């Protein structure tokens, strides 16, 4: 009986000792795992930081390359536009086109999509008619095609239009004399900047602007000419 009690006591003590050792091993293993987890987490953070820096550097290099490419092409493009010739403008209004303007226009050219038979230039689309209509009918025609009559903003655009006219006839543009404002006004509501070009002819009610060769003329709006749509 005593031997049996001694055996049971030893057995219980052995189980307690084994349980304690197992618990200690579990805590020890957890500490090791936690230690390596922290190390791996640190390595992962470092790698992510390196990748982020590499990506930023790559973006900067690409941006500098695009800018440099635009700058290199600026001189040749300016010469090309000068060779085209331009419409008659006020004295002293010619200005140099900056590299930034050229780069922006190239970027716009890459994103804009023009319909068939439309010409693309500096982020805009142009359509040159073969028919002849009055100024108001030309205006409506462009609106129906989700566009508007030609609005010229600078000498480069004027040179582009002149290059593509290829005719000596009058062509309507989106400019008319409004009696309400008593000034030449574009179809978008903005007034004509007199520094851009001269308008040859009277500035009076029922007068609309038309391009012919290298000049802008004031003509009666009911006259029938070809026209240019733009969007």
UniProtKB/Swiss-Prot annotation:
One Pfam family linked to the record: Lectin_C
Segments traversing the membrane: 39-59
Gene Ontology cellular-component terms listed: plasma membrane
Cytoplasmic topological intervals: 1-38
Alphabetically ordered keywords of this record: Disulfide bond, Glycoprotein, Immunity, Innate immunity, Lectin, Membrane, Phosphoprotein, Receptor, Signal-anchor, Transmembrane, Transmembrane helix
Residues that bear Phosphotyrosine: 7
Membrane topology: Single-pass type II membrane protein
Primary localization class, coarse: membrane
Swiss-Prot/TrEMBL GO biological process terms: innate immune response; NK T cell activation
Alphabetized GO MF terms: carbohydrate binding; transmembrane signaling receptor activity
Domain of life where this protein originates: Eukaryota
Modified how: Phosphorylated on Tyr-7; this phosphorylation is required for NKp80/KLRF1-mediated cytotoxicity.
Compartments (UniProt record): Membrane
Extracellular side: 60-231
Sites carrying sugar chains: 77, 91, 96, 176
Disulfide bonds listed in the record: 142-229, 208-221
Function description: Functions as an activating receptor involved in immunosurveillance upon binding to various ligands displayed at the surface of myeloid cells. Upon interaction with CLEC2B ligand, stimulates NK-cell cytotoxicity and cytokine production leading to the cytolysis of malignant CLEC2B-expressing myeloid cells. Actviation of the common cytotoxicity pathway involves SRC and SYK kinases.
Subunit comment: Homodimer. Interacts with CLEC2B.
Xref: PANTHER family: KILLER CELL LECTIN-LIKE RECEPTOR SUBFAMILY F MEMBER 1, KILLER CELL LECTIN-LIKE RECEPTOR SUBFAMILY F MEMBER 2
Protein name, as recorded: Killer cell lectin-like receptor subfamily F member 1
Species for this entry: Macaca fascicularis (Crab-eating macaque)
Record gene name: KLRF1
């Amino acid at each position: 009986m005593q031997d049996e009690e001694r055996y049971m006591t030893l057995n219980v003590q052995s189980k307690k000792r084994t349980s304690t050792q197992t618990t200690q091993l579990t805590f020890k293993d957890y500490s090791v795992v936690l230690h390596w987890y922290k190390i791996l987490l640190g390595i992962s953070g470092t790698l992510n930081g390196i990748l982020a820096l590499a990506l930023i550097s790559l973006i900067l290099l690409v941006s500098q390359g695009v800018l440099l490419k635009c700058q290199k092409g600026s001189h040749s493009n300016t010469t090309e536009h000068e060779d085209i010739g331009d419409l008659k403008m006020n004295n002293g209004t010619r200005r140099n086109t900056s590299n930034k303007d050229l780069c922006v226009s190239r970027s716009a050219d890459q994103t804009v999509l023009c319909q068939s038979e439309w010409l693309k230039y500096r982020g805009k689309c142009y359509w040159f008619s073969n028919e002849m209509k009055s100024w108001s009918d030309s205006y409506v025609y462009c609106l129906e095609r989700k566009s508007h009559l030609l609005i010229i903003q600078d000498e480069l655009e004027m040179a582009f239009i002149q290059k593509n006219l290829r005719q000596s006839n009058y062509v309507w543009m989106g400019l008319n004399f409004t009696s309400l404002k008593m000034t030449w006004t574009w179809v978008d509501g903005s007034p004509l900047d007199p520094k851009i070009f001269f308008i040859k002819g009277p500035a009076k009610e029922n007068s609309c602007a038309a391009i012919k060769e290298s000049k802008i003329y004031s003509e009666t709006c009911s006259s029938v000419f070809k026209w240019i749509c733009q969007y």
